[in-house]
């Protein structure tokens, strides 16, 4: 099982971001031009995962980066596990979940893809 983890989400541009540098009511960097910058941001994704997967509640922290791409986001999850695990074993479990209990929710591929290849992906 997972002892603790850090979720780093990489988000595509959203409609709430600025097209050019300007003032922001929240944080100074939220006013920076979205298409020219990688913008660190906060995220509630880690807490949301804990609500959907109760076993992970309180075990994940999160951070986000807004990047200049029009669509598709990704999550990098780094975990400390209760027991040692090999990379190939982790991939096998994730692939099995994508074909079983998380089918239609979690996608898995080892193809050499880039973000726009997922534009019509429903996961």
From Swiss-Prot:
The modification Phosphoserine is found at residue 73. InterPro entries: GlycerAld/Erythrose_P_DH, GlycerAld_3-P_DH_cat. Keywords: Acetylation, Apoptosis, Cytoplasm, Cytoskeleton, Glycolysis, Immunity, Innate immunity, Isopeptide bond, Methylation, NAD, Nucleus, Oxidoreductase, Phosphoprotein, S-nitrosylation, Transferase, Translation regulation, Ubl conjugation. The modification S-nitrosocysteine is found at residue 79. One of its GO terms (molecular function) is glyceraldehyde-3-phosphate dehydrogenase (NAD+) (phosphorylating) activity. It catalyses: D-glyceraldehyde 3-phosphate + phosphate + NAD(+) = (2R)-3-phospho-glyceroyl phosphate + NADH + H(+); S-nitroso-L-cysteinyl-[GAPDH] + L-cysteinyl-[protein] = L-cysteinyl-[GAPDH] + S-nitroso-L-cysteinyl-[protein]. A motif ([IL]-x-C-x-x-[DE] motif) lies at residues 77-82. The keyword Transmembrane helix does not apply. ISGylated. Homotetramer. Interacts with TPPP; the interaction is direct. Interacts (when S-nitrosylated) with SIAH1; leading to nuclear translocation. Interacts with RILPL1/GOSPEL, leading to prevent the interaction between GAPDH and SIAH1 and prevent nuclear translocation. Interacts with CHP1; the interaction increases the binding of CHP1 with microtubules. Associates with microtubules. Interacts with EIF1AD, USP25, PRKCI and WARS1. Interacts with phosphorylated RPL13A; inhibited by oxidatively-modified low-densitity lipoprotein (LDL(ox)). Component of the GAIT complex. This is Glyceraldehyde-3-phosphate dehydrogenase. It comes from Cavia porcellus.
């Amino acid at each position: 099982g997972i002892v603790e983890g850090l979720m780093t989400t990489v988000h595509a541009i959203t409609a709430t971001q600025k097209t050019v540098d300007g003032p922001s009511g929240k944080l100074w960097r939220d006013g920076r031009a979205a298409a020219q910058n990688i913008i660190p941001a906060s995220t509630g994704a880690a807490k949301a995962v804990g609500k959907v997967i109760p076993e992970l509640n309180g075990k994940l922290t999160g951070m986000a980066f807004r990047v200049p791409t029009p669509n598709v986001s990704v999550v990098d999850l780094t975990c400390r596990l209760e027991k040692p695990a090999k990379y190939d074993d982790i991939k096998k479990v994730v692939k099995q979940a994508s074909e079983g209990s998380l089918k239609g929710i979690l996608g898995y591929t080892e193809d050499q893809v880039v973000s726009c290849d997922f534009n019509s992906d429903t996961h």
